[in-house]
């Protein structure tokens, strides 16, 4: 050890002396003595590492209290931090998918703060069923005989298969053997459910005769899977749900469908691309239909199954149902969201997902231009700020080839160095409320479609 290093080490303060500093007294009151002492020990270790490696004191040496405060605040932040989603993907899986309506937020808060009638029948003063209230709503909206709720749509598919076709064959078109995020594959789910996959048709063409020829004494289900996260175009042929349901009736084989994203309203009335609706499949005679709660429906993560009463009863009595059941917060949020669908005239205003999807390009562009003028003074020395047209996507595997015209604020470094974009994006990710955009074509793009809280955005961007 050199004499210079030894001198620097000697300048490091003792923990006891720091603890008696007035600034540290307030930190001890807020975070507790033990946590502050543990932090100071780590800070001293960090300081020794800096001295050993650089022969200098750390840059925060002059204000230990401020550095400790920053570290304690960072450690106290929730792992689930609010962010500003300007990626251009409305239902961003990594950012939590659908934002909840105010009614859903209030319902969840109430369910957390007080005992609720989760499985209690007020009329009979005995045990009730946790799905009952939602089943009534879902039947009213979809026209189904009954309904079942689990914790996500993957669970819904697993439960449908395990409860109705374990040990039997399930007939599916080869072009519908989907894989979604996290390597969730229909063939794997079938195997886990104890079913045998029977593929029919080809990747791009499947005919009604393929299903008929596949049926044998061990056939348990005919299954239709909506390819919500990819599209096959060109020389194609599929069997529609109504036709498949007719085949099922002829051969006395139940037909089930996995809709994936599942919209409860006709999106085309809002100028959006059409998606198949559960009520259409129920009307066509499909026995069971599953779909997600947190995609186009705009509610919490949940798996929803609607259909024939007798088959729903099979699901409810299966051991997996208890393992996969939804909790009271999910049920509270989902019920509040479904009630919004009873007043369709106000849905686009009250349901955040639909509100964001239906924003006009003109209103988004006006917002971007207005905010660009205010941000130019802050970033103009290093970056050229422009408002450019762009295309948003719905996300979460919904309508994969369809895009929504939007507008973005773009940041292009004057010196053309891509590293400046990476540094800027990293800086925004470290903000108290991170701002998340995307880097593309030599620019950092902030798609403004999902920006509703302008004041919070500007507060972060001007830090």
From Swiss-Prot:
One Pfam family linked to the record: SelA
Pathway the protein takes part in: Aminoacyl-tRNA biosynthesis; selenocysteinyl-tRNA(Sec) biosynthesis; selenocysteinyl-tRNA(Sec) from L-seryl-tRNA(Sec) (bacterial route): step 1/1
GO cellular component terms listed in the entry, alphabetical order: cytoplasm
Annotated GO biological process: conversion of seryl-tRNAsec to selenocys-tRNAsec; selenocysteine incorporation
Major location (coarse): cytoplasm
Record-linked InterPro entries: PyrdxlP-dep_Trfase, PyrdxlP-dep_Trfase_major, SelA-like, SelA_trans, SelA_trans_N_dom
EC number: 2.9.1.1
Class of the enzyme per the UniProt entry, highest EC level: transferase
Compartment list: Cytoplasm
Keyword Transferase found: yes
HAMAP family cross-referenced by the UniProt entry: SelA
Listed name of the protein: L-seryl-tRNA(Sec) selenium transferase
Highest classification ranks of the organism: Bacteria, Pseudomonadati, Pseudomonadota, Gammaproteobacteria, Enterobacterales
């Amino acid at each position: 050890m050199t004499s210079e290093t030894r001198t620097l080490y000697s300048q490091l303060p003792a923990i006891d002396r720091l603890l008696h500093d007035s600034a540290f007294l307030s930190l001890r009151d807020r975070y507790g003595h033990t946590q502050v002492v543990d932090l100071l020990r780590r800070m001293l270790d960090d300081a020794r590492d800096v001295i050993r490696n650089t022969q200098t004191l750390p840059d925060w040496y002059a204000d230990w209290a401020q550095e400790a405060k920053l570290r304690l605040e960072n450690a106290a932040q929730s792992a689930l931090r609010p962010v500003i989603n300007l990626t251009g993907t409305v239902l961003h899986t990594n950012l939590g998918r659908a934002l909840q309506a105010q009614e859903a937020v209030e319902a969840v808060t109430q369910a957390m703060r007080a005992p609720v009638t989760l499985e209690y029948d007020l009329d009979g003063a005995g045990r009730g069923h946790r799905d009952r209230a939602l089943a009534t709503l879902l039947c009213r909206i979809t026209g189904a005989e009954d309904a079942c709720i689990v914790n996500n749509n993957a669970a819904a598919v697993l439960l449908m298969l395990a409860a109705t076709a374990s040990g039997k064959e399930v007939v599916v078109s080869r072009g519908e053997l989907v894989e979604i995020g996290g390597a969730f594959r229909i063939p794997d789910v079938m195997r886990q459910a104890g079913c045998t996959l029977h593929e029919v048709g080809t990747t791009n063409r499947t005919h009604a005769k393929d299903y008929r020829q596949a049926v044998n004494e061990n056939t348990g289900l005919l299954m239709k899977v909506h390819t919500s996260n990819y599209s096959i175009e060109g020389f194609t042929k599929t069997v529609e749900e109504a036709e498949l349901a007719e085949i099922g009736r002829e051969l006395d084989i139940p037909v089930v469908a996995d809709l994936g994203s599942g919209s409860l309203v006709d999106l085309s009335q809002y100028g959006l691309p059409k998606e198949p609706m559960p009520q259409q499949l129920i009307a066509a005679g499909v026995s069971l239909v599953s779909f997600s709660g947190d995609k186009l429906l705009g509610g919490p993560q949940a798996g929803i199954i609607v259909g024939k009463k007798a088959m729903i009863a099979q699901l409810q009595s299966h051991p997996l149902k208890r393992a996969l059941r939804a909790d009271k917060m999910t049920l509270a949020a989902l019920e509040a969201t479904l009630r919004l669908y009873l007043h369709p005239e106000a849905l686009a205003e009250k349901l955040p997902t639909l509100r964001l999807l239906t924003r006009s390009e003109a209103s988004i562009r006006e917002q971007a231009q207005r905010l660009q003028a205010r941000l130019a003074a802050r970033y103009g020395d290093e970056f050229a700020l422009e408002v450019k047209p762009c295309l948003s996507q719905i996300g979460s595997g919904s309508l994969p080839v369809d895009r929504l015209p939007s507008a973005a604020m773009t940041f292009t470094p004057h010196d053309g160095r891509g590293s400046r974009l990476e540094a800027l994006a990293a800086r925004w990710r470290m903000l108290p409320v991170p701002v998340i955009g995307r880097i593309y074509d030599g620019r950092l793009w902030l798609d403004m479609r999902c920006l509703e809280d302008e004041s919070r955005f500007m507060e972060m961007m001007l830090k």
